[in-house]
């Protein structure tokens, strides 16, 4: 599988949100604004404690895209992250402090049905379990009821 330019995908996603090509809600627009502002802050504000690691983001996105769908019409095919998914993964894993500690340790992502949230959550969970370098990492998933699980 060829390497994609995830940072370029993130920037195009931001542009699409800002110009209205992608219909976005208030919080999605604010997340884009924060991301773009923080990219500028890392360059201009010496008190800003975070930097964006394209290498780290690429590592996580590549890890997820090397996983395969396990059932349905896409079974045995690689995951391909949608631009919004690259934006989410990039924000969660790309920002770090000078010690390499992630800026964000919690994320709340609201996604409607049939839009790839289970596959994204599985990819992030697997990465956190075995790719993040945390000793004794554990990943839990929960659901509101048995059918949802």
Could you describe each region identified by the protein language model?
Residues 2-149:
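Phosphate/NTP-binding elements of NTP-utilizing enzymes
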């Amino acid at each position: 599988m060829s390497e994609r330019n995830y940072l370029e995908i993130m920037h195009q996603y931001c542009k699409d949100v800002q110009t209205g090509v992608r219909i976005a809600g208030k919080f999605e627009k604010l997340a884009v604004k924060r991301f773009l502002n923080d990219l500028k802050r890392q360059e201009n504000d010496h008190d800003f404690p975070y930097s964006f690691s394209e290498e780290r983001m690429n590592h996580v996105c590549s890890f997820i895209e090397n996983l395969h769908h396990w059932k349905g019409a896409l079974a045995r095919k690689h995951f391909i992250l949608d631009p919004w998914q690259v934006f989410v993964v990039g924000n969660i894993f790309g920002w770090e402090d000078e010690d390499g500690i992630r800026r964000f340790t919690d994320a709340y992502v609201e996604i409607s049905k049939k839009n790839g949230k289970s596959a994204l959550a599985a990819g992030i969970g697997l990465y956190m379990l075995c790719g993040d370098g945390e000793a004794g990492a554990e990943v839990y998933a929960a659901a509101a009821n048995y059918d949802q699980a």
